[in-house]
Amino acid sequence: MKLKRLAAIVLALTLSSSMLVGMTACGKKEDDTKTKASEVTVQIGPNPETLDPALNSAVDGGNMLVTLFEPLLIIDKDNNVVGGQAEKWEVSDDGLTWTFTMRDGLKWSDGSELTAKDFEYAFKRLTDLDLASPYAETVIGMVEGYADACGNPDPNTGDPTTEPNKDLLNVKASEDGKTLTIVLAYPCSYFDKLAAFATLSPVNEATITANGDAWAVKPETYVCNGPYMISEWTPNERIVCKKNPNYVGGWDNSKIVTDTLTFLLLEDSSASFAAYNSGTAQLIKDVPTEEIPSLTGKEDFHVDPILGTYYISMNLNNEIFQNPLVRKALTLAIDREYVANTVMQGTYSPAYNYVGPGVVDAEGMFLDNSKAANGGKTYIGEDFAANLEEAKAALAEAGYPNGEGFPTITYSTNEAGYHIPLAEYLQQAYKELGITLNIDKVEWASFTPQRRAGEYEMARNGWVMDYNDASNMIELFYSSNGNNDGKYNNPDFDAA
């Protein structure tokens, strides 16, 4: 794999990649929070782009979906894969056939029966090219018949080259709806983790048929199967969820003590912090960056490591970024230590590789292969002064000495967290190369769709891992991957 050709600039990661920053009301008295255990209000992000499990690709939407839907399997508090809607599962000796046995008494939130046939429908729905599920290839690309079911899309245009037929996907529910059998084209050691991923949740065919895309935006049509169900949705304000009285699954109902769970839909960290301090919210994800030094060490302030990487996407449909020397220059001009420890106040760790520490084989086979492809050293060294000189030399070799003749770049980002301070740092960093960078601030509701559609030049990006395997990050650069925002297209890479 020619990783140096990837259309991304790796910025910072932690255990590896980034840190989850937030506050919980554990240190407050009940009188202060004005809440009871039966009612909890949390802030984990703004209005979600979508709450259709097949279409979501954002962390905040994913955090909501795990309360509203339950896949075949779930991940317990100890990070173990356990039964969800399936009470047990078996894998054939060759690792290809996975058989899931459903729990008894499964129901949808509207009280109707839920069976393995609903999972078959959900899996096959992902092959619909018109649906354009960004995660489809990631979660079922290894299932036998996937490419044929999709119509064998052209890698350049995405158009089918054969007649799509969802029934060619080798996923089949038994006649009684009690078992689901999935046959893989090749063994996938982490398929159990995929079976616990929100994208592979069942969806209700009746409500989708009756309401089309609108099924996932109104409480009255939002039929789900998780511990909670939506009772009220005021866009850009709040989503109120009530306990699902029909829930049967992997979680112990007796331990689900919160009757009402409200998602406060805020992106502005100052507004989130104010909501927390007033007792309106009992848990928030976003706090103002300037407050972090004074909050550090307090009982209700938490900084926890997560697996993921913060990076920059360069749109390879833009001719300027098709030159690998330009990409190299823009990459090496970033002082990762300064970004992680000063701009991001120590909540991130510097990233000198795309796949960070904590990921299986990140510091073993993956790093060894990366060094072997680059003369025995990593592509990005820790000596920033040397990196900057190498960046200037690369830009000159590309035909832009001291940035002469290089076009102005527009960098797109939303405004949450450290995104704007980072963008402002990049402006200064690229000035050292003689390059002008403009910042385009985009509302969150438009940001990810715009980036996915390729309507940008450079854009902030990031990936929080869905499962602990380097493939989860590397596959983002397959030309057919729905999350390939940089539009990287390399037949050799696709074939690897």
Residue ranges and their predicted role:
Residues 43-93, 223:
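N-terminal lobe/hinge region of extracytoplasmic solute-binding protein
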Residues 77-80, 157-158, 166, 184-255, ...:
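Gly/Pro-rich hinge or "lid" segments in bacterial periplasmic/extracellular proteins
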